[in-house]
Amino acid sequence: MEINPFALGVSTLVEKNVGYITQIIGPVLDVAFPPGKMPNIYNSSIIKGKNPAGQEMNVTCEVQQLLGNNKVRAVAMSATDGLTREMKVVDTGAPLSVPVGEATLGRIFNVLGEPVDNLGSVDAGTTSPIHRSAPAFAQSDTKLSIFETGIKVVDLLAPYRRGGKIGLFGGAGVGKTVLIMELINNIAKAHGGVSVFGGVGERTREGNDLYMEMKESKVINEQNISESKVALVYGQMNEPPGARMRVGLTALTMAEYFRDVNKQDVLLFIDNILRFVQAGSEVSALLGRMPSAVGYQPTLGTEMGSLQERITSTKEGSITSIQAVYVPADDLTDPAPATTFAHLDATTVLSRGLAAKGIYPAVDPSDSTPTMLQPWIVGEQHYETAQEVKQTLQRYKELQDIIAILGLDESSEEDRLTVARARKIERFLSQPFFVAEVFTGSPGKYVTLVETIKGFQMILSGELDNLPEQAFYLVGDINEATAKAATSQVEN
């Protein structure tokens, strides 16, 4: 029986262990095997045949439960429309395997590791199973260092750890995906780093936008595909829950190869981790498990841990993971975001209030929690500047109610100065993105950490008190703000 060579790393499959479908419940199948030939949990099985309309079918599924009486329950990785009872199911004898290595860069894959970009087959030469153990404790690297992103608000107030796990928390439409796209762009251009993007249950349009954006910015080089810096793995909203549940593991497996074999520092982007949880919840219900808190699966902690514990730094290389986390109804106590919190080194919370003001990226400094913002890690100058910025913004927040009642004129001179500087800081935290040039009309800017610290120190010290606050909006470094102020003065 011919099967997909990219899914399993073999060109033909010997029918050693053949079962047949006994029941189909949406994306979940019950399969009977001969006595003594039960497949293992997580083994992949192939269903090939013709549907009632005479069309060829090729469905891969993964064993999830052993039911007894020589039956297993499996979850399909693609649509089950057209499958019928009594169809033959061939056990491959191994978990799902996907292509890994340089051949994956610049290409788009589905959960099975099949290329879906119409650019031909992938000559990877090597495949890896998507189910693996986390690196041994002795292999872990505990060294702390900052990962510069070129985004002012992130680098100053919520710095990322190299080899850490970072969560982007926010409701719908506050800019999580745009921030991820900018990070991929900056990391590829400034660091020459390799990235793997896992699109887990997000909109197909967003996946297409990301691909087009990566081509425009030359992160994916269509003319010379080997020079590309990112591999894309998609399991979008229209896919069955099995694919959405496993596509994160496919992306992670590709990233692990760059870390373990090529000994590189890799970036792994997952958008969106909540869709991974939701897919697990759908599968859990179909497998007959009793729901837990708020209807989520009882195995939520285990499923999250099996993904997150593999994302780590070793002495050979690192995986720095940035995960978008959709927060249902903006409720951070929901079990899905709450379970994710436990695994993260830093959280970047995106605020609807800031987005409404037009401050992009809409990162909320008061809600974001960086574990790396310690003087012995980032240095005294960075730490003190960040603390002073936070204190100024916090004081501004406290004064807003008083100003709303009495007006700014009734405030003390000191409070008026604090408000003026805080408003400049708030605007200076905005930044034009390379990937959002179409929307903002401003060319994107990469700002180094040194320039970022210098700019905020100048605002805090009062050197720029005479400049209008609008000069600080959507600029890169502080020199641009002063130039913008000078230009507007001439125009007026």
From Swiss-Prot:
Species this chain originates from: Huperzia lucidula
InterPro entries for the chain: AAA+_ATPase, ATP-synt_VA_C, ATP_synth_F1_bsu, ATPase_alpha/beta_chains, ATPase_F1/V1/A1_a/bsu_N, ATPase_F1/V1/A1_a/bsu_N_sf, ATPase_F1/V1/A1_a/bsu_nucl-bd, ATPase_F1/V1_b/a_C
Known function: Produces ATP from ADP in the presence of a proton gradient across the membrane. The catalytic sites are hosted primarily by the beta subunits.
Assigned protein family: Belongs to the ATPase alpha/beta chains family.
The keyword Transmembrane is annotated on this UniProt entry: no
SUPFAM superfamilies: C-terminal domain of alpha and beta subunits of F1 ATP synthase, N-terminal domain of alpha and beta subunits of F1 ATP synthase, P-loop containing nucleoside triphosphate hydrolases
Catalysis performed (reactions): ATP + H2O + 4 H(+)(in) = ADP + phosphate + 5 H(+)(out)
GO biological process terms on file: proton motive force-driven mitochondrial ATP synthesis
One Pfam family named in its UniProt record: ATP-synt_VA_C
Alphabetical keyword list: ATP synthesis, ATP-binding, CF(1), Chloroplast, Hydrogen ion transport, Ion transport, Membrane, Nucleotide-binding, Plastid, Thylakoid, Translocase, Transport
Gene name for this UniProt entry: atpB
Sequence positions that bind ATP: G170, G171, A172, G173, V174, G175, K176, T177
Membrane topology recorded in Swiss-Prot or TrEMBL: Peripheral membrane protein
UniProt subunit comment: F-type ATPases have 2 components, CF(1) - the catalytic core - and CF(0) - the membrane proton channel. CF(1) has five subunits: alpha(3), beta(3), gamma(1), delta(1), epsilon(1). CF(0) has four main subunits: a(1), b(1), b'(1) and c(9-12).
The EC number(s) this enzyme carries: 7.1.2.2
Localization annotation: Plastid, Chloroplast thylakoid membrane
Keyword set includes Chloroplast: yes
Protein name: ATP synthase subunit beta, chloroplastic
Sample GO molecular function, one term: proton-transporting ATP synthase activity, rotational mechanism
GO cellular component, one term: chloroplast thylakoid membrane
